[in-house]
């Protein structure tokens, strides 16, 4: 099964990993307070101590030229199956939105916080998508909150924006 490995750190440190591993498809982005690098592969990763996710639904290809929103969705063992079933069965008509590039639904290897990556041409295109019924009905905090479990036992639903690095 294809996996997505993610690590956070300084731009320089992560960029050096990328330079030292030209045979691996490593994607590096800038976040608000850090840099992030990820590798999507069926094989072994070069990243040390990454967060590990199994890719359970994918559309399109990753590119370092796109804007991404990573949505972290907390769940519990009691709700994870239902959450996963709901997200797998979502009609992927969101691919028709202007600027849409890619989508990944990820199951955590450890824990119960799922992750979704939405790739768009830029943040403006993503913000337009966030105003849609497709987003509000299937991916918003309100739409997914009943899969979170009891409060205090989980991390929060949140978004992290990943920007292309302009060199």
Curated annotation (Swiss-Prot):
Gene3D superfamilies found in the cross-reference section: 3.30.70.100
PROSITE patterns, alphabetized: ABM
Entry's induction text: Constitutively expressed.
Compartment(s) where it occurs, according to its Swiss-Prot or TrEMBL record: Membrane
Modification sites for Phosphohistidine: 66, 79, 154
MF annotations from Gene Ontology: heme oxygenase (decyclizing) activity
Assigned keywords, A-Z: Membrane, Phosphoprotein, Virulence
Residues annotated as domain ABM: 67-158
Coiled coil regions in record: none
Known outcome of mutating residue 154 to A: Abolishes induction of RNAIII synthesis and toxin production. Reduces phosphorylation
GO CC list: membrane
Modification after translation: Each of the three conserved histidine residues contributes to TRAP phosphorylation. Phosphorylation is essential for TRAP activity. Phosphorylation of TRAP is activated by RAP and necessary for the induction of RNAIII gene expression but not for ongoing transcription. TRAP is dephosphorylated from the mid-exponential phase of growth, which is when agr is activated and AIP is produced. RIP acts by inhibiting TRAP phosphorylation.
GO biological process: heme catabolic process
InterPro entries: ABM_dom, Dimeric_a/b-barrel, Heme-degrading_MO
Primary residence: membrane
Family of the protein in this entry: Belongs to the TRAP family.
UniProt-listed PANTHER family: SIGNAL TRANSDUCTION PROTEIN TRAP
Functional summary from the UniProt entry: Signal transduction protein, which is a major regulator of staphylococcal pathogenesis. Phosphorylated TRAP leads to the activation of agr system and consequent RNAIII synthesis resulting in the expression of several virulence factors. Up-regulates the expression of most toxins and genes known to be necessary for biofilm formation.
Descriptive protein name: Signal transduction protein TRAP
Organism: Staphylococcus aureus (strain NCTC 8325 / PS 47)
């Amino acid at each position: 099964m294809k996996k997505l490995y993610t690590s956070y750190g300084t731009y320089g440190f992560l960029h050096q990993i990328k330079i030292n591993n030209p045979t691996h498809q490593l994607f590096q982005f800038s976040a608000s307070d850090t840099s992030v690098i990820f590798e999507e592969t069926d094989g072994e990763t070069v990243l040390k101590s990454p967060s590990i996710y199994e890719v359970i639904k994918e559309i399109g290809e990753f590119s370092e030229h796109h804007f991404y929103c990573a949505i972290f969705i907390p769940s519990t063992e009691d709700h994870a199956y239902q959450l996963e079933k709901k997200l797998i069965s979502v009609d992927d008509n969101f691919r028709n939105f202007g600027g849409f590039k890619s989508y990944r639904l990820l199951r955590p290897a450890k824990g119960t916080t799922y992750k979704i990556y939405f790739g768009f041409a830029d943040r403006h295109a993503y913000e337009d998508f966030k105003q849609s019924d497709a987003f509000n009905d299937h991916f918003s905090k309100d739409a997914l909150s009943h899969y979170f479990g009891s409060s205090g036992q989980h991390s929060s639903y949140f978004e992290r924006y990943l920007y292309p690095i302009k060199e």
